Swiss-Prot record:
The keyword Transit peptide does not apply. The keyword Protein biosynthesis does not apply. Pfam families: Ribosomal_L22. It comes from Orientia tsutsugamushi (strain Boryong) (Rickettsia tsutsugamushi). This is Large ribosomal subunit protein uL22. One of its GO terms (molecular function) is structural constituent of ribosome. The lineage of its organism: Bacteria, Pseudomonadati, Pseudomonadota, Alphaproteobacteria, Rickettsiales. Part of the 50S ribosomal subunit. This protein binds specifically to 23S rRNA; its binding is stimulated by other ribosomal proteins, e.g. L4, L17, and L20. It is important during the early stages of 50S assembly. It makes multiple contacts with different domains of the 23S rRNA in the assembled 50S subunit and ribosome. The globular domain of the protein is located near the polypeptide exit tunnel on the outside of the subunit, while an extended beta-hairpin is found that lines the wall of the exit tunnel in the center of the 70S ribosome. The gene is rplV. Belongs to the universal ribosomal protein uL22 family. It comes from the Bacteria. Keywords: Ribonucleoprotein, Ribosomal protein, RNA-binding, rRNA-binding.
């Protein structure tokens, strides 16, 4: 969609939210200008929006400080959600039994790039 010149990346690992829920938020910001993406995340009521916003701001800072890119021309090129590790816990039940519950973690990879 956009012709990218240079890009900067940021990753956030071991986020305590399932990848399925996190992917709902990242779908909102893909292919948006960075300023529009931050506004989307700022007014979102989802809990995952805070973590995505933190990772996006890290990618913006990497683009500005490491690569010298102009913030006004940055676009969210990729927002990829990966499956992290799964923490397994036991919940005591009746008659001495125990049920296993899974707590999912996610990894988030955001790439921003400067457009022409």
């Amino acid at each position: 969609m956009f012709e990218a010149k240079k890009s900067a990346k940021a990753t956030l690992r071991m986020i305590k939210i399932s990848p399925r829920k996190l992917n709902l938020i990242t779908g909102l910001i893909r292919n948006l200008k960075v300023s529009d993406a931050i506004m989307q995340l700022k007014f979102s009521k989802k809990r995952a929006a805070v973590d995505v916003k933190k990772c996006l701001q890290s990618a913006i800072a990497n683009a500005e400080n490491n690569d010298g890119l102009d913030i006004d021309n940055l676009v969210v090129l990729e927002a990829i959600v990966g499956k992290g590790s799964v923490m397994k816990r036991l919940v005591p039940r009746a008659r001495g039994k125990a049920f296993r519950i899974k707590k999912f973690f996610s990894n988030l990879y955001i790439t921003v790039s400067e457009i022409k």
